[in-house]
From Swiss-Prot:
Positions with a binding annotation for heme b b562: H84, H183
Subunit (UniProt): The cytochrome bc1 complex contains 11 subunits: 3 respiratory subunits (MT-CYB, CYC1 and UQCRFS1), 2 core proteins (UQCRC1 and UQCRC2) and 6 low-molecular weight proteins (UQCRH/QCR6, UQCRB/QCR7, UQCRQ/QCR8, UQCR10/QCR9, UQCR11/QCR10 and a cleavage product of UQCRFS1). This cytochrome bc1 complex then forms a dimer.
Residues binding heme b b566: H98, H197
The protein's name: Cytochrome b
UniProt cross-references to CDD domains, sorted A to Z: cytochrome_b_C (cd00290), Cytochrome_b_N (cd00284)
Lineage of origin: Eukaryota, Metazoa, Chordata, Craniata, Vertebrata
BP term (GO), one: mitochondrial electron transport, ubiquinol to cytochrome c
InterPro entries from the UniProt entry: Cyt_b/b6_C, Cyt_b/b6_C_sf, Cyt_b/b6_N, Cytb/b6-like_sf, Cytochrome_b, Cytochrome_b_C_euk/bac, Cytochrome_b_N_euk/bac, Di-haem_cyt_TM
Protein family (similarity comment): Belongs to the cytochrome b family.
Domain of life: Eukaryota
Length: 380
């Protein structure tokens, strides 16, 4: 039989083993679609970002007007910018659902895959943050000022660290220039880490909704899951395009239509919606260093999840108590997101503190406890 180039060519066989002949569990649900959706989000963001970078000027006097120029005078510039800005929102929606799937179905027990995923999340958050500063509107400027200022909470070297990050004594031209450089670089770093993430995943193969070995029943990725991924893609792109074309500024802040002014502070400084949960946790602690540590812990806690798994079953499919706790956590995160968008006053302060406390309690205390309890129930 003639050799199949798909299976023998050094480059094509890597693609073949990852996307065509990959043995995949026969029962993975739509919750397993988000990996491919994230890959498409990344490609979309890199392409639209590249086109935007061709028309952008990373200078404090020109940044705001260069973005306005892109939207007004560049062919389809408005479309490229709206796709890029709202693409970030969909990127985060997909990554949150992807992480939620991992939590629910115990995918975190593939430790290397999970840890590289957490690194990807952190890199994505960094990329989104530096990107938000680039249009140099009011919220861009003040968001950059507030968040970079948090480094000053580091004992002894804090102030030096902040001035080093700023490239001066305030957020100014050097800050914008380096943020643009980082925003251009990081998506390619994300693409690199994604390949590592997939390499680790393909070492073990995919998990499945039952949490049991699927070695006895695997099917090829193509055509079964390639077509399923394309369906998922159309289902994601429909609301994405609806948002980007019909209400592109829905998720943005009106303050960002005003050019950055260091002399005027906006009444409410808040980040984009996808950072609000962490922002609420940061604000719920009335101490700078404590807040910064809580902020870091709110994401880094994901690294502890594999060690807090006490159940004899991998997934939550047959664990109603853990399921209840999981959805409680989801509701808790929605409350934190809402609190992050509210002013710092009664009753929002106490609600935020309660929600922050319950966030850490659910993950660190209640999940292991309920897992152990369910093991005991199994014996009766």
């Amino acid at each position: 039989m003639a050799p199949n180039i798909r299976k023998s060519h050094p480059l094509l066989k890597m693609i073949n083993n990852s996307l065509i002949d990959l043995p995949t569990p026969s029962n993975i649900s739509a919750w397993w679609n988000f990996g491919s959706l994230l890959a498409v989000c990344l490609i979309t963001q890199i392409l639209t970002g590249l086109l935007l970078a061709m028309h952008y000027t990373a200078d404090t006097t020109l940044a705001f007007s260069s973005v306005a120029h892109t939207c007004r005078n560049v062919q389809y510039g408005w479309l490229i910018r709206n796709l890029h800005a709202n693409g970030a929102s969909f990127f985060f929606i997909c990554i949150f659902l992807h992480i939620g799937r991992g939590l629910y179905y115990g995918s975190y027990l593939y430790k290397e895959t999970w840890n590289t995923g957490v690194i990807l999340l952190l890199t994505l958050m960094a990329t989104a943050f530096v990107g938000y500063v680039l249009p140099w509107g009011q919220m861009s400027f003040w968001g950059a000022t507030v968040i970079t200022n948090l480094f000053s909470a580091v004992p002894y070297i804090g102030q030096t660290l902040v001035e080093w990050a700023w490239g001066g004594f305030s957020v100014d031209n050097p800050t914008l220039t380096r943020f643009f450089a980082l925003h251009f670089l990081l998506p390619f770093v994300i693409a690199g880490i994604t390949i590592i993430h997939l390499t680790f995943l393909h070492e073990s193969g995919s998990n499945n909704p039952l949490g049991i070995s699927s070695n006895s029943d695997k099917i090829p990725f193509h055509p079964y899951y390639s077509i399923k991924d394309i369906l998922g893609l159309t289902l994601m792109f429909t609301p994405f395009l609806m948002l980007a074309l019909f209400s592109p500024n829905l998720l943005g802040d009106p303050e960002n239509f005003t050019p950055a002014n260091p002399l005027v502070t906006p009444p409410h400084i808040k980040p984009e919606w996808y950072f609000l949960f962490a922002y609420a946790i940061l604000r719920s602690i009335p101490n700078k260093l404590g807040g910064v540590l809580a902020l870091a812990a709110s994401v880094l806690i994901l690294l502890l999840i594999p060690f807090l798994h006490k159940s004899k079953q991998r997934t939550m499919t047959f664990r109603p108590l853990s399921q209840t706790l999981f959805w409680l956590l989801v509701a808790n995160l929605l409350i934190l997101t809402w609190i992050g968008s509210q002013p710092v006053e009664h009753p929002f302060i106490i609600i935020g503190q309660m929600a922050s406390l319950s966030y850490f309690s659910i993950l660190l205390i209640l999940f292991p406890m309920i897992g152990t309890l369910e093991n005991k129930i199994l014996n009766y």
